[in-house]
Amino acid sequence: MNTTIKEAKQYIGQEVTIGAWLTNKRSSGKIAFLQLRDGTGFIQGVVAKAEVDEEIFQKAKEITQESSLYVTGVISEDNRSDIGYEMQVKSIEVISEAHDYPITPKNHGTEFLMDHRHLWLRSKKQHAVMKIRNEIIRATYEFFNDNGFTKIDPPILTASAPEGTSELFHTKYFDQDAFLSQSGQLYMEAAAMAHGRVFSFGPTFRAEKSKTRRHLIEFWMIEPEMAFCEHAQSLEVQEQYVTHVVKSVLNHCKLELKALDRDTSKLEKVTTPFPRITYADAVIFLKEQGFDDIEWGEDFGAPHETAIANHYDLPVFITNYPTKIKPFYMQPNPENEDTVLCADLIAPEGYGEIIGGSERINDLELLEERLSQFELDAESYSYYLDLRRYGSVPHSGFGLGLERTVAWLSGVEHVRETAPFPRLLNRLYP
């Protein structure tokens, strides 16, 4: 019977065949231990010299790392195993033998591993990170579908940009100038006026010459927009969504979190409501903590965000940033018009901002004024202005960066490990 490693637990005491790759092996003279993977999981195959033909035992000792195999044997319970079972191997068929596999069990440098990213993905830890990424995506669709959101796909090639100060990737669109999208937000606002509650999930591109552990050139964003939704309501949706994702990963990725040696105690504390601190109070807090490199009106850097998050040891909203350091489309704060109705959600443990969101300006004259203040061409945003001409309503939205969220939940140090094939400042291959 052919099966997968994940499904093999249904066949305790039965003989099955599994297609797999050999990740590692060891031998103690009369027994060979094969570490096998098939994409659904990892299992140990035990080859006892006394129970198989000499040819099979010799083959087990000689198989090379990452060779592909059909392995037949009896599934037996093993309480020492992470999955609770192993295979007593009876026969081995080599499909394709791998020669001189470059990523050996020894330690390798980061650049070497990134040069071989197409192979590094096969390792147990990288496999675990991608499974957690997949679960975050699955839980995202589950949350928004269950809460009445419609999935909308904004274009990747655009004529204008929502973040006026960010660097863009320029290309030619026949005889016109075009840019790779840095956010689908403006289009999602239009979609929200048709469907009420919408979300998108897709790639975004930012030509920022940054080499920090938090930045990728190409990354994926989840971007919901909600009509008839004010800032406070949006914060509630954000914390409900993040809590749902965290609980889903904890429930469905136990083996992956264990493979990564992730301490889940802090993730288990994540629940609504999240703490909130205004930008102004955050500046005061930082000064009290000895930071003398921040003044009101300046944006926070990674050390500042980490200090704030460490104080709460939970995801924390920093609200009401100064108008001058945020994009043009954010609704003024009626209690202080030098600030806007916005929030960044900062993940604990030093992972930084994972969500940026705001209530959007819904008044036409104010939006036109802001475009002028930010020295943006109003004609390029004519369709965006139309949304305020024809039935404008209070509306809010946010964007969650997938890779930073994966890094936080999986506990990896650098976001380069959270994308299958990351695009970094000096890396476009593989």
Swiss-Prot record:
Residue ranges spanning the membrane: these are none
This enzyme catalyses: tRNA(Asn) + L-asparagine + ATP = L-asparaginyl-tRNA(Asn) + AMP + diphosphate + H(+)
Report the EC number(s), separated by commas if there are several.
6.1.1.22
The signal peptide here is none
Against InterPro entries, the record matches this protein to:
Aa-tRNA-synt_II, aa-tRNA-synth_II, aa-tRNA-synth_II/BPL/LPL, Asn-tRNA-ligase, Asp/Asn-tRNA-synth_IIb, NA-bd_OB-fold, NA-bd_OB_tRNA
UniProt GO cellular component terms: cytoplasm
Q: Does the keyword Protein biosynthesis apply?
A: yes
What name is this protein filed under?
Asparagine--tRNA ligase
Name one process (GO BP) from the record: asparaginyl-tRNA aminoacylation
State the similarity comment: Belongs to the class-II aminoacyl-tRNA synthetase family.
SUPFAM superfamilies given in the database record: Class II aaRS and biotin synthetases, Nucleic acid-binding proteins
Q: Where in the cell is it found?
A: Cytoplasm
- One Pfam short name: tRNA_anti-codon
Entry keywords, A to Z: Aminoacyl-tRNA synthetase, ATP-binding, Cytoplasm, Ligase, Nucleotide-binding, Protein biosynthesis
- Mind listing the GO molecular function terms for this protein? asparagine-tRNA ligase activity; ATP binding; catalytic activity, acting on a protein; nucleic acid binding; transferase activity
